[in-house]
Amino acid sequence: MNILIVCNHFYPHNRIATFRLNAFARYFREAGHSVTVITEGDRDETAMWNGCEVHYVKDPVITSSKQESLLQRRKKWAFRRILSALQFRLFLDYKRIWQFKACKKARKLAKSRQFDVVLSSYGHLSSHRIAYRLHRKMPFYWIADMRDETSGRTGQRLVLVLK
C-alpha cells in the first residue's frame, strides 16, 4: 500500500509532534508499506529516512530553524516574523504560503504514483488543506490526525457559557 504523510514536523526536528509522525512512518514501513512524507525543511530536497522517502519543502517566508534562532536571540520584530504573523491573522495559518509549494509537490508525486492512504497531521492547518485539495482530485482514504486538538476542558467552558 502506498501511504503519503503530509506534516509540518518530521525528522530531524526535535519536537513531540515529530516523534509521533516519525513513529507512524517507521511502523508503516516496517509493516511493508511504501511511505512518502512531505514536510517542511530548511531547503527543498529529497532524502531517505528509515526506508521512507522524505520530501522537504522550504517555507519561502520563514523556516522553523530561522524562527527558532530569532526567538533565541530575542528578536521579536524581524520582517519574516511579522509576515508570518500577518499570514496567521489573515488565514488562521502560519504556513499558508508554504501550503502552495507543498501542494504543488504533493500533486506532482500523486501523478507519478497512486496513493492509497494520505495521513495529514495537525501542526498547522495547511497539512489538512493539502490533503483536502488532493482528495478532491484523486480517490484515496484520508486520515486527518488532529493530535491533542480537543484534549482541553472545552466541554466545561461550554457549560459555563450556557448557564
Regions found by a protein language model. Give the residues of each.
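A conserved catalytic-core segment of Leloir-type glycosyltransferases
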Residues: 37-101, 105, 109
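A short acidic, amphipathic alpha-helical/loop segment
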Residues: 130-134
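Nucleotide-sugar donor phosphate/pyrophosphate-binding loop at the beta->alpha transition
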Residues: 138-143, 151-163
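N-terminal subdomain of nucleotide-sugar transferases
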Residues: 1-62
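Histidine-centered beta-alpha loop that forms part of the nucleotide-sugar donor binding/catalytic region
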Residues: 8-10, 122-123, 146-149
